[in-house]
Amino acid sequence: MKVGIIGASGYTGSELLRILANHPEAEVIAASSRRYEGQKIWKVHRFLKGFYDLEFCSPELSNFGDCDLVFTAVPHGEAMKYVPQLLDSGIKVVDISADYRLDKETYERVYGKKHEGYVEAVYGLTELHREEIKKANLVANPGCYPTGTILAASPLAKLELIERVVFDCKSGITGAGESPSAFTHYPNLHESIVPYKITEHRHYYEMVQELGRFQSDIKISFTPQVYPGSRGILTNAHVFLRGELTREELYRIYEEFYEDSFFVRIQESVSLSQVRGSNFCDISIHPGEDRVVVVSAIDNLVKGASGQAVQNMNLMMGFDETLGLRTPPLFP
């Protein structure tokens, strides 16, 4: 299977290259970067020396014509320039940008941008939409925060047990992207945790969309924060239930919901160090007097982005969804 990556020089693109380097069925034949066009991949991503001798190309679609599937790992507003033409050429697409995660009207309102060439996609949270993904030509890879939050709350939302849920999320700095800024500057983040886009983060609308499929009247609050680490998203989901459930009942609900999901592990406790560098989402459940706290941990670059994209690629191309991804986390 021949694959391409449009936008391969950033963190998400380089993580795709890392994962695909050892995929037994995938060969990367084209990887684009406007900034590094003509340079060897390993000269830009030095950790990949010995794995790729390919040069970065331009994002012109002629460079991707021989691909069976293309990943678009570009900023929102850019993927829509490529996706319709790729689909028209018979090439399947996993879009890692935000361009196809929401319906057209919501996207234009939330992102403040007219959506040119809108095509309906399958939302690529694999554990929720596995069968639809198998038949899809276009999969919209979820955002990193929605991956951790939706997986944390879905088992209870499916049973319509949630009165309201408060998502308190902390993300590593790679979630802000590769481009340096005052926000990501070392002195501003060192020994600090910084909340941002409070009540305004665009990922909120993915949570509403997906959890609303289970429970239309669910009430959601979401506060993202950045901590001075490179990878990982820890979500504390404060779930206020309709009725009471014992610890045993809660764990049974989660274990049954995810019994066929290799990459979701129900644990007694979780931490970011237990999932680093892997495609796992670890979840623990902690009932209290007035709420249940569900904690989820993911690597934002893997399960929160490139790993889940490869998981979706596997299903789209008829492979086992774990192919090339059965890698234990890095520990310590």
UniProtKB/Swiss-Prot annotation:
One of its GO terms (cellular component) is cytoplasm. Its EC number is 1.2.1.38. Gene3D superfamilies: Dihydrodipicolinate Reductase, domain 2, NAD(P)-binding Rossmann-like Domain. Pathway: Amino-acid biosynthesis; L-arginine biosynthesis; N(2)-acetyl-L-ornithine from L-glutamate: step 3/4. The active site is at residue 144. Pfam families: Semialdhyde_dh, Semialdhyde_dhC_1. It catalyses: N-acetyl-L-glutamate 5-semialdehyde + phosphate + NADP(+) = N-acetyl-L-glutamyl 5-phosphate + NADPH + H(+). One of its GO terms (molecular function) is NADP+ binding. The keyword NAD does not apply. It is found in: Cytoplasm. The keyword Amino-acid biosynthesis applies. Keywords: Amino-acid biosynthesis, Arginine biosynthesis, Cytoplasm, NADP, Oxidoreductase. Disulfide bonds: none annotated. One of its GO terms (biological process) is L-arginine biosynthetic process. Catalyzes the NADPH-dependent reduction of N-acetyl-5-glutamyl phosphate to yield N-acetyl-L-glutamate 5-semialdehyde. Belongs to the NAGSA dehydrogenase family. Type 1 subfamily. NCBIfam families: argC. HAMAP family: ArgC_type1. PANTHER family: N-ACETYL-GAMMA-GLUTAMYL-PHOSPHATE REDUCTASE, CHLOROPLASTIC-RELATED, N-ACETYL-GAMMA-GLUTAMYL-PHOSPHATE REDUCTASE, CHLOROPLASTIC-RELATED-RELATED. This is N-acetyl-gamma-glutamyl-phosphate reductase. It comes from Archaeoglobus fulgidus (strain ATCC 49558 / DSM 4304 / JCM 9628 / NBRC 100126 / VC-16).
